[in-house]
A protein has these predicted regions:
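N-terminal amphipathic, basic-rich helices that act as targeting or association modules
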Residues: 4-81, 86
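Alpha-helix N-cap/helix-start motif at coil-to-helix transitions, marked by capping-box chemistry
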Residues: 16, 244, 616-619
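Mobile "lid/hinge" segments at catalytic clefts and subdomain interfaces of large enzymes
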Residues: 2-5, 75-338, 342-356, 370-379, ...
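Glycine-/charge-enriched secondary-structure boundary and capping motifs
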Residues: 2-15, 19-21, 27-38, 177-179, ...
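Generic alpha-helical structural signal
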Residues: 30, 261, 419-422
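Non-catalytic terminal/interface segments that mediate subunit docking, oligomerization
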Residues: 49, 60-109, 113-115, 119, ...
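Generic alpha-helical secondary structure signal
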Residues: 20, 249-252, 620
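Short amphipathic alpha-helical surface patches that mediate protein-protein
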Residues: 42-46, 59, 271, 334, ...
Length: 743
């Protein structure tokens, strides 16, 4: 169809717009849009760009805090003051649909895109995390996806030179056709040295810098805004192709550019490419732009103007340059051998005007395109699923207690969701370019030193989607709380979060119920921990159609949190230090096995509520442990999560080749005591010399604590029964996942 061709409501529907949205576009323009204009609206009003089905609820999240230097959603990433004149810039985003079709490029470009969001703000990336979800690890498809995704992340990240310092990997059949690939990056910038994503200065030049533009990723935003089906393989051209070496050059050029104060605004070209960056920068600065599409460097012949507008070719950015500084900017990009081409100018009016060989092919008010502006806002139907009340009827008394707990323990430690992920993370470079403290001496959170400072950044990513499925509000509170717990256990102070909200189809009332419940839970927990939401993204339509059946994934609101370690001498690790140290649990134990790996994998029970959780209790437990760390009383700290107490004890033991001797609580079922996943529990170790001081500090009514046992030279003993040696369990733990994926 010709760029200037007239359109109809049928054309709009083919591009993914609703009939009423087409009517609104005609109303905004005061005329019928041409084909180019309709394409622009189709991507900017897609779910991926407009958040039209989520923005109403996202606005309810807490976004303010004294440490916040940028309002959520107004810049390329979140920005938080970390003291000493420095700020941490961080964000998490999804690349789920592209990774489902082309796992290597889908994951690689996800890594590239999230890092561009960081350095486009003038911050140098220092570390990456990722959160990955796959189907049954025994299936051929899952093995193909794992191999491609991990290679994509490692190839791009290792080549780009930014370490991957942590993350999480889960397997569940609900992700069989629709994996989740969520990528996080964090960087450091001087306070006041950040670059805005807003255009300003009438008459200032608009440049495109980076790679040339091709057809890869055209309509990628629209592709990410619909269900994955058996026909989705036809959408592979919507998957972008990345070049980490070009991105490295772009990073260094941008760092140099940030020093000369010649840039008035800069934005990464991600979803919807030039269309999105020009519209968001213009709307953000309340200005317009004239853009000459024939000036854009292309790498494929015969590209139509609308293809150039919608291309999602990677490693590109839009830069607004201060008038008179054009040569300074050009010299920097020439030095790094990177395309730097003037393609437009900032104008006074609110209009975005696009030209092709001096002919105007589109004219649109910028504000009408963007979320929070003229883009649609919907509130979808909500319906509580039947399973929700059914899950709450779960009765632990109907679950038989196993006669051989050791046999169960061996199975638990080798489960794909429990066992070591070294098969995956050993493919990542965890040390390049930074001082990562977590490689040799792990903490619950990843700890990255700040050059020239005694401070460090703690960062973590967490979400147990089975908990969220069982109870969206409680499950999401747990996700936020576990992030905070991990940072506290590492010696840090939680600061702020970013989120990646992965859900099914928002037009499904039960899915929308899950989504709204998750927002409520996130809001409550973030307010309690004083961790404002800096931004993130929403990824709907994560589900799979096989024949006539559509199954949404478990709701997966992935939370990434950063915290500040004010003194690296206070960093606390998880491994046992010395034989004879005493093992204490801070927080109460309940007779609870709900939604645990034990219940699902040993008893085959999928229907149960979220684990027992109380937000105030959680907060009190964390404050207690934080105080113990500050007073340098304890030797290690490790939170209890998947797999329960036994797995937590083993993880600390295996890192040090030490063992443990413990006694279970006779008032609680042994399986619940060892493998239950009730929340708000932290295992600490303390030397006998410090035990009295520990007890004195813990003798308050607000937080329960009890002696669990002591550290041994290597033997594992439970209730005076010999369970073998730590090396046996470590062999199971280290090799189980690799043996499955290599079959």
């Amino acid at each position: 169809m010709d760029s200037l061709s007239s359109t109809t409501v049928e054309t709009a529907q083919e591009l993914g717009l609703l009939p009423e949205e087409y009517d609104e576009i005609c109303n905004v323009l005061g005329r019928t849009p041409n084909f180019t204009e309709l394409n622009i609206y189709s991507v900017m009003w897609s779910e991926h760009c407009s958040y039209k089905n989520s923005i109403k609820w996202l606005k309810k999240l807490p976004k303010d805090g004294p440490q916040m230097l940028a309002k959520a959603g107004e810049e390329n990433a979140g920005l938080v003051d970390i003291g000493e004149g420095l700020a941490c810039c961080f964000k998490i985003e999804s690349h789920n649909h592209p990774s489902a079709l082309e796992p290597f490029q889908g994951a690689a470009t996800g890594v590239g895109g999230i890092n561009r969001d960081i350095f486009t703000m003038g911050a140098r990336p220092i570390a990456q995390l990722n959160s990955l979800r796959f189907g049954d690890p025994n299936s051929v498809r899952t093995k193909w996806l794992v191999n491609g995704v991990v290679k994509g992340i490692s190839t791009y990240g290792n080549s780009f030179g930014i370490p991957t310092v942590g993350g999480e990997v889960y397997f569940d059949k609900c992700y069989e056709q629709n994996p989740l690939v969520n990528a996080f990056s964090a960087g450091i910038v001087d306070v006041g040295g950040q670059i805005s994503a807003k255009a300003e200065g009438v008459g200032n030049a608009v440049y495109i810098v980076g790679s040339s533009t091709g057809r890869d990723g055209v309509h990628g935003a629209a592709f990410a805004s619909k269900d994955l089906t058996e026909d989705s393989a036809n959408d592979i051209p919507s998957v972008q192709v990345g070049d980490p070496f070009q991105e490295k050059l772009l990073l260094e050029a941008t760092m140099e550019l940030a020093k000369i104060d010649a840039v008035k605004g800069m934005q990464d070209m991600g979803a919807a490419g030039i269309t999105c960056s020009t519209s968001e920068m213009s709307a953000g600065g309340k200005v317009g732009m004239d853009i000459w599409l024939d000036k854009v460097p292309t790498r494929q012949e015969g590209m139509e103007p609308w293809e150039i507008l919608l291309s999602e070719s990677q490693e590109r950015m839009l830069v607004v340059v201060d008038k008179g500084r054009e040569n300074d900017v050009q010299d920097i990009f020439d030095k790094w051998d990177i395309h730097c081409k003037k393609i437009g100018v900032v104008t006074a009016g609110p209009l975005l005007r696009y030209f092709w060989n001096e002919e105007k092919i589109a004219e649109i008010p910028a504000e009408s395109l963007v979320l929070g502006g003229g883009a649609p806002i919907y509130d979808r139907e909500i319906k509580e699923p039947i399973y929700f009340k059914k899950f709450k009827k779960f009765d632990i008394k109907k679950i038989p207690e196993p006669k051989d707990l050791l046999h169960v323990a061996k199975k638990i430690i080798a489960l794909p969701n429990i066992s070591s992920k070294k098969y995956i993370y050993e493919q990542y470079d965890s040390m390049v370019g930074t001082k990562n403290r977590s490689t040799n001496e792990p903490s619950d959170a990843s700890i990255v030193n700040i050059k020239g400072s005694k401070r460090a950044i703690a960062m973590t990513v967490d979400c147990n989607s089975r908990y969220v499925h069982a109870d969206p509000e409680v499950g999401t509170m747990i996700a936020v709380s576990e992030n905070a717990r991990n940072i506290i256990c590492s010696g840090g102070e939680p600061s702020a979060i970013t989120n990646c909200l992965n859900f099914g189809n928002p037009y499904n009332p039960e899915v929308y119920w899950q989504f709204t419940g998750a927002i409520k839970g996130m809001s409550k927990a973030c307010k309690r921990f004083s961790t404002p939401v800096t931004g993130g993204n929403v990824s709907f339509y994560n589900q799979t159609q096989v024949g006539d059946t559509i199954e949404p994934i478990f709701p997966t609101p992935t939370i990434a949190m950063i915290g500040l370690v004010k003194n690296i001498d206070n960093v606390t690790t998880i491994q046992y230090k010395t034989k004879g140290d005493l093992i204490y649990q801070i927080g109460p134990t309940y007779e609870d096995i709900a939604s645990s790996q034990y219940l699902v994998n040993i008893h085959g029970v999928d229907e149960s509520p979220a684990p027992i959780f109380d937000l105030e209790q959680e907060f009190s437990v964390q404050k207690k442990v934080q105080n113990l760390i500050k007073k340098e009383i304890i030797s290690s700290a490790h939170d209890i999560s998947e797999g329960g107490l036994f797995v937590t004890l083993m993880e600390s033991a295996m890192l040090s080749n030490l063992g443990f001797d413990i006694t279970t609580d006779s008032s609680i079922r042994s399986d619940a005591y060892l493998f239950g996943e009730s929340q708000s529990r932290i295992i600490i170790t303390v030397s006998p010399d410090n035990e009295d001081e520990l007890i004195d500090l813990m003798m308050t009514k607000d937080v329960e604590f009890h002696l669990v046992g002591h550290v041994t030279k290597g033997a594992i003993r439970i209730d005076d029964h010999d369970w073998g040696d730590v090396k046996f369990f470590r062999d199971l733990y280290d090799n189980a996942l690799g043996e499955i994926l290599d079959k």
